[in-house]
Amino acid sequence: MKLTRPKLIETIRRKNEGWTTYQARKIAGISIRRVNQVWNEYQLTNQVPDIGKKNGRPPKHVEQWEMDMVRQTYQKYRVSADTLERLIQRDFEKHIGHNRIHRILLILGFAKKKSKKDIRKKDWIRYERRHSLTAVHIDWHYDGKTYVFAVIDDASRKLLALLECNSATTDYSIQGMELALQQGKIRQCISDHGAQFISNVDGDSRFKAFLLQKGIKQILCRVKHPQSNGKVERWFECYDRHRSTFETKEEFVRWYNEMRPHRALNFEVLETPAQAFIRKMKAEA
């Protein structure tokens, strides 16, 4: 139950009358510890304590060095406050709490105020290959101006190829896979049932023939089940959010692969997709 001012006054009055703390706590339905807190403050000041949201310690003023440090780190990595806290600790050996960082991001205009309180996230089971290049996810995406083709390594989340085209075609899909193959031998390719990847008539296509020629097994997602290709779908959200910050796609690819830590990887050491790609590379016999 909530401790209101009328209940607080009644609780203190009963304590003055000789009630025990256990008896007085039942008036407002609060803990014995809380009754002792307000009773001790009343005895020290001889006044009914103020209660409410705005009676705590005043917020500490944000200093300029904190603003500069958060701005510099965000513009370099473009990640959430929780990740920025770790990056600032690593890069500058300074500690700024993530709640304070979020407050600074709001001031700088790099974040939006949340409309509701965060809900604690549940742990989830993540399905991924153990080794790099065991499987890749591919798909097309239209951002309103450009057709985007991406090849994402399943194990490391590394972006192996990125094309920005004026149309989504089989030829461009093959071109994108050829770029990805420059990273090494790919075993499996996971895609949806897009016309660029299969034939709607008999299931055969030039793209499928290309994969067979390269010794790559094609795995098709279940129809109307985008979660099967969720890694690349989630990556397109990152593309839409951050691509406009970079002048060229090469700069964007370098930022994503080599600078931005990925939470699905070894986050304790702020591992990037490029680092995970090397770590998870299977040693050849």
Give names to the regions the model predicted.
Residues M177, L181-V201, R222-K224, N229, ...:
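Acidic/histidine-rich, metal-coordinating catalytic segments
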